[in-house]
Amino acid sequence: NPDGRDRYVNWFNQVKATPYSIDQNAKEHVEPWPSGRPNHYLFDLNRDWAWATQVESSQRIAIYNKWLPHIHVDFHEQGINNPYYFAPAAEPFHEVISDWQRNFQTQIGKNHAKYFDKEGWLYFTRESFDLLYPSYGDTYPTYMGAIGMTYEQAGHGRAGLGIQTNEGEVLTLKDRAIHHMTTGLSTVEISSKNAVLLNSEFKKFFDNSNLKYKSYVLKNENQDKLNRLKKLLDKHEIRYQSAKEGRAKGYLYSIQDQGKMDLTSSDIIIHTDQPKGKMVKVLFEPKAKLADSLTYDITAWSLPYAHGFDAIASKTKLPSSNVAKDSTIKNSIARSAYAYISKWNSIEDATFLGALLQENIVPRFSEKAFSIEGKSFERGALIILRNDNRNAEFDAKLIAIANKYQRSLTTVATGFSDSGVDFGSYSVKPINQQKIAVISG
């Protein structure tokens, strides 16, 4: 998993012996924290395909969805004493995986085995690495219709140019490269021989008429939260629409049982009758069906639960319409304002706060709810006082940041509240520049 490849290579070049040492205790085989496993933000990109929290993931799935390959291999490395792993995968398989996808993995594995047996190379299959959790480099492609597979070669961050395994064998970088090359070419070979079937079965995968739920509805109770999820769906090229006013029957996520939900035009609907319908099922279904409780990773990831939405899954396709374009917030400078106020409701508000601090704008926050000039604010509201920010560019900077992050600012001419705390209260505290220390050793 070379997400931090440059970090690993730079470290290795600093400590390697010439010629290389095969002793497991040599410094070149004991990579320090944080290792080359994660990216710059110490995130495991191999678990980020579906969630796309990292910029690398967003860029990767954009390319993936441009091509939508029939075959996708995720080449990895594992511990030095585990020789080589290739398809077929272990149970559990998600139920959307077709019989063809299952069976062709076995054909691919047998083709690899032919070449490994000839050379006397060790390998294993059908262990450890299952096809359930949707955010891997094998499952994500699988749920997009491909034959998605993980190939794991012994080595990882320990092997360097060569290392002696616990069995006394010397594993070299050349060995590792040849093994991956062999399975790679074997994959191309068996795929080429089955090109017609690959095409026809790939097409069949996108028939979503047999899916249990036809529509998933997300209740819009927080526009920031909804916008965040819409951006994620856009990355995966999953279509969504606005609900039409009415009442829907189906599986209510909040009670985990059958129920009803009143719909408004601000709610969104994701239908399974679309090219990415099976991925919609995988990401939105209330409970993934488990064929085997022993699995390599988590078993619950349903987006409505993960993002905190009231939601309903309907067995009938609900009426919907095209989503209206989001309105743009445009704040204006108010030089006579005593203070600007911004509500605190979402992660986006925290992003806005961070941007203010980076521009040396001093905000305060209220620990208690208050009302002022006829408007009510819950605790956590940001209060940006003119008296705390006495520089000529204060208003212009604040408005520019608020407009950039689409935060609506309320201006007030006084710090005297209608009810609740006044702005000089000890419950209204300044937020100073934060300095974070990371201790390592």
What are these regions (language model features)?
Residues Y41, R47-D48, T53-V55, Q59, ...:
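Intrinsic-disorder/low-complexity accessory segments
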Residues E77:
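Detector for the c-type heme attachment site
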